[in-house]
From Swiss-Prot:
Entry superkingdom: Bacteria
NCBIfam families documented for this protein: PRK00218.1-2, PRK00218.1-4
InterPro entries assigned: HflD, HflD-like_sf
Record has Cytoplasm as a keyword: yes
Lineage, top ranks: Bacteria, Pseudomonadati, Pseudomonadota, Gammaproteobacteria, Pasteurellales
UniProt gene name: hflD
Keyword entries, A-Z: Cell inner membrane, Cell membrane, Cytoplasm, Membrane
Compartments, as annotated in UniProt: Cytoplasm; Cell inner membrane
Keyword flag Cell membrane: yes
Family classification: Belongs to the HflD family.
Species: Actinobacillus succinogenes (strain ATCC 55618 / DSM 22257 / CCUG 43843 / 130Z)
GO cellular component, one term: cytoplasm
Protein name: High frequency lysogenization protein HflD homolog
Membrane topology term: Peripheral membrane protein
Length: 204
């Protein structure tokens, strides 16, 4: 198997992990903490040494994403598929917009310093990341419609959490493009991606 399918599977797992976190927040008001910290951490990695470094140095940190990717490639959950495929679509729009890419790079450059005095999962962190998503990513294309419990979705703080996770999904989607990922592969090379994802999952 070509090694690039492993990198493609890893990046897609990052996208799927972000999508799963969105679903967890929307339905339960809380999410897998390790997966959440990993996804948010990925946003601060602009020059990683390798692909694992994006996810806190270990692929075990995207276990939730690998599980979700494997499930999705076997039999798609329509709600979840709308999230991760929507993230891929928005990332495609982003790469075609020089203005949006420059704006995103500029905002992300200052994010580590802005968050220096706050925890990775603090309300301020969620708010900063959500604002970047709202200002730059959301206007690029069709909005991702999130469904869940009105008890949680009516809370502004939950909106911030969900948008921060969507921004993390965009980070992994950009990585997916960088390692050679394409939508055609999802249609025609699904088995290769699935095989790679299963192999990675079994080794973590």
């Amino acid at each position: 198997m070509a090694s690039d399918y492993f990198d493609i599977a890893i990046a897609l797992a990052g996208v799927c992990q972000a999508a799963k976190l969105v679903q967890q927040f929307a339905h339960n008001g809380e999410a897998d903490l390790n997966a959440l910290e990993t996804s948010l951490y990925s946003l601060l990695q602009t020059e990683p040494e390798n692909i694992a470094a994006v996810y806190r140095g270990s692929l075990a940190n995207i276990k939730l994403g690998l599980e979700t990717l494997i499930e999705q490639l076997n039999a798609m959950d329509t709600e979840l598929a709308r999230y991760w495929l929507g993230i891929l679509a928005l990332s495609g729009k982003l790469t075609k917009s020089a203005d949006a890419k420059n704006a995103l790079a500029s905002r992300m450059q200052y994010l580590p310093a802005q968050l220096e005095h706050y925890g990775l999962c603090s309300d301020m962190t969620f708010e900063k990341m959500a604002t970047i998503y709202t200002d730059i990513i959301s206007p690029l294309g069709k909005k991702i419609h999130v469904i869940g419990s009105s008890l949680y979705l009516q809370q502004p703080s939950m909106h911030n959490r969900i948008r921060a996770c969507l921004l993390a999904g965009i980070r992994s989607a950009i990585l997916w493009q960088q390692v050679g990922g394409t939508k055609w592969q999802i249609l025609f090379s699904r088995r290769k991606i699935l095989k790679a994802a299963k192999h990675i999952y079994e080794t973590i």
